[in-house]
Amino acid sequence: MLSPMKKVCSLVLFVSLLAGLEFPDLDLILIFILDHRSIITHGILIPLFLYRYLTKEGKQNLINKYLSKILTSKKIKNEILDYAYIGFLIGIAIHLCADLFPKAYIGYALIKLPFFISIGAPLSIAWMLGNIFFALKIAFTKLNEKDLKEKSKNLIFLAIMIIGIIYLIIDSNFVSKITLMVISFPIIWIYARKGYKIIKR
């Protein structure tokens, strides 16, 4: 049975996951600044740098400003930030699984640099695959560092898979997308867990 705090953290993870699913398409709202499939939103650059900034020593004033009235413990604030980061990265990874299988690698299917410069099909594929791997590796490693029972971790992973499949199945060419997910996610999950256990020893 999860404690109330762990239930809150799990909720934060899944809400952040849903936010991460939608985050890459933020470029559609900013289409006059960022072309669709912008390298800035279709990857882990923003969450990675934001998380590193917020977890730096002396850089937690933003967290304290918005959460101090609700949460008094620095440890709890950091836990919530960690779970939000984990969920957000996983959401981006699922979204990129969908983006890897367009009808054709032309136009909006390609990753764009600032100033609407396309990086081409091969680099677009490599970028998305690389970001899927690193997003999941970071997220799953951090999740396995958490003080949760193995059963709870496995249930969270199962829920992630179910959410991902539901998200992908409503899209076109869903068989290829789901196949990529059901192969890559468990492999990286196992890889992240084994790596964590080796470090822990």
Map each language-model feature to its residues:
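N-terminal membrane-targeting hydrophobic helices
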Residues: 1-201
